[in-house]
């Protein structure tokens, strides 16, 4: 169906976003042993003296409960209903409601040997603790750290590794080389433009490493500009979605929950998608107005690519990239 008016466009894009399978690139949760459930979800947002909960994550928590058909007005009853699920079945229900295609759950390098996942949609994101590159008496033994990353990736089957705290020397002498040798994709958080500049220099010096970079709203514009000319760089742009659409088309990641609980992940996705589809509508509208033959089928393909298709395509092609 060719779309010719704004209302049809809005309806089509909204429907496509809500129906699409999504890839979650950062879940801060121990999928094997971490505590989850309604009690854990509502601990920080419980009503105080009957007042309306306005905490930052309240909407996401209650959106998750609604999606899971848990009674929002009766938390004890909701917890009782949830207790009737096995852990595996409850996690599966969350992923089903989210329409999750893949969820990258953090696995500490120190727990890699015992990492086990109860659903094949969950993939390990090997995570380095903040003190991993802390210097000892004789400095940092980068070769030893690289060997630890290599061993941990083999133990848990990880193809992705995350560094939360930028360290240019660690990138140069350990992470970039080990990602080249072990064919790992590097996830990196960048808190300043200076860090982004240092990271881009390291990425450009390598000919094979693929990376997913992300930062706060002040860093996103620089990363978006950088990704426009770097095929091996994907950017996660949660706040600057219109700019990313303008500069990168659909080749970026518009969302990550960074949630501590699976239910929180579900709720944050439900709220995040309500910001994604209007931005997509605004990007499509000029095309529709100038007579471009925009169809609902094309929009569905676009949305699927945006919400994880590009990320998984890069994942599947990583090994090919090392042969280039």
Segments from the language model and where they lie:
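Metal-cofactor-binding active-site regions of metalloenzymes
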Residues: 2-184, 204-208, 224-324
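Metal-dependent catalytic cores of enzymes that make or break cyclic nucleotides
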Residues: 188
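Membrane-embedded translocation segments of transport machinery
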Residues: 199-202
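Extended, well-ordered protein cores
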Residues: 217-219, 230
